[in-house]
Amino acid sequence: ISPIAWQNDDLPELTKEYTMEQALQEAREIGYTGVERGQRMPHDTEGLKAYLENANIELCGGWCSGNSLVNNFPEECEAIGQQVDQFVELSSPCIVYAECSNTVQGEIQTPVNGRPKLTRDEISSYASKISEVAKWCADRGMPMAYHHHMGSIIETEDDVNWLMDASSSDLNLCFDTGHLLFGGGDVMATLDRWGDRINHVHYKDCLLYTSDAADDSLR
């Protein structure tokens, strides 16, 4: 489970009363044995390892802010290398990679419809780049789980399909039900199509009337 179930990283004021210690304790009480790395956890490897051991919980992944759209291959590997090595050290089953260059997800005043949109050919070109990075991660012992996300270049069902069609088998998918539904996608159709390449799942709900209202406000 991810600590964002307790703590909103984009709107921290909404959940400031929830401590990370409370989140981890309640996660264990519910029955979870692993959590993703959270922003309020130690970021150094030894500190994070001790922190999780003290909470009797393991690392099961965590967000990685990627910039493969604008970085070349060596630049991107250098940028994410420390986190990849940390996750290998802590035996995480994957790293949850999301493209953050030009994303609007953290810009509260910008509607998600203002996100950068790529053509199919542009996504195919991007898929070649991110496949290289995914292979590099896998060769170091850390499978990549690509997170499609509202406000980013890979948001809609078409975006996901185009990316997965054009990428290598080194690129796996972090299947996020809430983001896909909010983006207007067919959750079950996407699951059926790419199930064999899904290696991490975010089960989230979505208030459809909220997403409909957001769509209406952007027309």
Please give the residue ranges for each predicted region.
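Active-site acidic/histidine proton-transfer and metal-coordination neighborhood
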Residues: P74-F175, F182
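N-terminal pre-domain/capping segments
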Residues: I1-P93, D121, S128, A138-M142, ...
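Conserved protein kinase catalytic core
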Residues: D9, P42, I153, F182, ...
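Active-site beta-loop-alpha junctions enriched in small/polar residues
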Residues: I4-W6, G38-R40, C64-N67, C100-N102, ...
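Non-cysteine beta-strand/loop elements that form the S-adenosyl-L-methionine
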Residues: I1-S2, I95-A98, R197-L207
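A short alpha/beta connector and helix-capping loop motif
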Residues: G185-Y203
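Histidine/acidic-residue-rich catalytic or RNA/ligand-binding cores of hydrolases
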Residues: T156, G184-M188, S211
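Conserved small/polar residues in nucleotide/adenosyl-binding loops
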Residues: Y209-D216
